[in-house]
Swiss-Prot record:
Organism domain of life: Bacteria
Lineage: Bacteria, Pseudomonadati, Campylobacterota, Epsilonproteobacteria, Campylobacterales
Name of this chain's protein: UPF0174 protein jhp_1494
Family: Belongs to the UPF0174 family.
InterPro entries: DUF3944 (IPR025217), Ubiq_cyt_c_chap (IPR021150)
Amino acid sequence: MAYKYDRDLEFLKQLESSDLLDLFEVLVFGKDGEKRHNEKLTSSIEYKRHGDDYAKYAERIAEELQYYGSNSFASFIKGEGVLYKEILCDVCDKLKVNYNKKTETTLIEQNMLSKILERSLEEMDDEEVKEMCDELSIKNTDNLNRQALSAATLTLFKMGGFKSYQLAVIVANAVAKTILGRGLSLAGNQVLTRTLSFLTGPVGWIITGVWTAIDIAGPAYRVTIPACIVVATLRLKTQQANEDKKSLQIESV
């Protein structure tokens, strides 16, 4: 199976190997740390040639995701890859996420991450929600009820920026811990995650419940769900890096 040009995955070619590590591991390893029985990445020429220098074969990594996507669509010809947006929409269906297939991929990814965050907020008590709003620097919250605080958090997430990226990393990290048994390298930045570490508990519990139901649906989803969440987070990281560069350029003028 060859890589099908996919504009939603082309940005992976711009990333460093350290960024691609999480996606590689999601595609290759299961929760027990053993290689997935049907993974083809580590037997590829690209892997044998470049090893952990993932940036050298980002296209082959994207191809592997398309391959797993084809395994979750019974209607597709075996061996023919599926474009990322179709995989993402299939994942959203499994997670019961509301979305419009005609909208931009980034918006669908945002809806997916928002759904997980929303469900984690539902599991928090009033004090936890208030604490999170304080950490996110949401102002004038003293007179807001729990529902309004949750709405403010979701609105902040959808507005984008560093706080949105921070929340996305925490959501993705909780998914990785639950599904893969380990966190993401993206979450290694303590400055990024330490202030919102309390959120990983509720998110992890929610994902555990969701995963128990989804696991029966087929082994392909054990890959495509965390892979889509990692891709969405990497895209946010790229967008945030671009915004930071623009800000620096403006300041230097």
